[in-house]
């Protein structure tokens, strides 16, 4: 006997969260809970404004239609990426095919203060990895901050994300302020320039490795080994079903590329599932999941070690 619930939710964000020049005041999304006999599975559907092609209202419409079809015995996955991902997670939990083991070692997001980062890294076992957003301020400032961090913490490796913010000139201005002796400790820089060709040129000219992120979701993208390209950053909420995520990870690994499972600012429920996916598909790589502290609450499932208050399922708005 099948049953299902769909919940709508909204979490207040910290004041300083800006995405693509838009201030994100709340994180809005949906949960689906599928039950069959004694088993149940949960999934999160939370399109990311400015990044997802669909709105959460559109996702809600597709999700409710899919749930009604599933209750009638149809299991075909929807095409909309955020819905496909959430539904496939719920089905995987229901079938017990999403392993419970999780990788909660998130690469901490750094605001540029080395003292703050040293404290965060002190408790991190093994490899010291942190992430810095660049491209929000002047490229020269970004270069100076990155250089300062690498100089202050000799065993640090940085992941940088520019979200295609730079022209070739700005990319050169950034690199000019990063000591060439430190550049090998930049694990990768995600999408430095507005075009892939400019990003490839940046990697060749600076010796700083790059990673593809937005490019993975463009119709002309193909997985190929390229000089200067070291990694792909996979955001499942923007990608689609668990199977599609797994295919992308396998394609990257086959070329010797690092695959990083990364957050699209999901709630704690979605983040804990991403931690499980990371442990399953990319066990040797620290995922990019350090986004929970951008929110003012957790929901339904806790992230280990977080002190944020938890909103239980009874407090959510039920749609079905």
From Swiss-Prot:
Cofactor dependence: a divalent metal cation
Transmembrane segments: none
Keywords: Lyase, Magnesium, Menaquinone biosynthesis, Metal-binding
Residues that bind Mg(2+): 161, 190, 213
UniProt-listed Pfam families: MenC_N (PF21508), MR_MLE_C (PF13378)
InterPro entries recorded: Enolase-like_C_sf, Enolase-like_N, Enolase_C-like, Mandelate_racemase_C, OSB_synthase_MenC1, OSBS_N
Catalysed reaction, written as an equation: (1R,6R)-6-hydroxy-2-succinyl-cyclohexa-2,4-diene-1-carboxylate = 2-succinylbenzoate + H2O
Protein's pathway: Quinol/quinone metabolism; 1,4-dihydroxy-2-naphthoate biosynthesis; 1,4-dihydroxy-2-naphthoate from chorismate: step 4/7; Quinol/quinone metabolism; menaquinone biosynthesis
SUPFAM superfamilies associated with the record: Enolase C-terminal domain-like, Enolase N-terminal domain-like
Uppermost EC category: lyase
Residues annotated as catalytic: 133 (proton donor), 235 (proton acceptor)
Family: Belongs to the mandelate racemase/muconate lactonizing enzyme family. MenC type 1 subfamily.
Free-text function comment from the UniProt entry: Converts 2-succinyl-6-hydroxy-2,4-cyclohexadiene-1-carboxylate (SHCHC) to 2-succinylbenzoate (OSB).
Protein name in the entry: o-succinylbenzoate synthase
Species, as recorded: Escherichia coli O139:H28 (strain E24377A / ETEC)
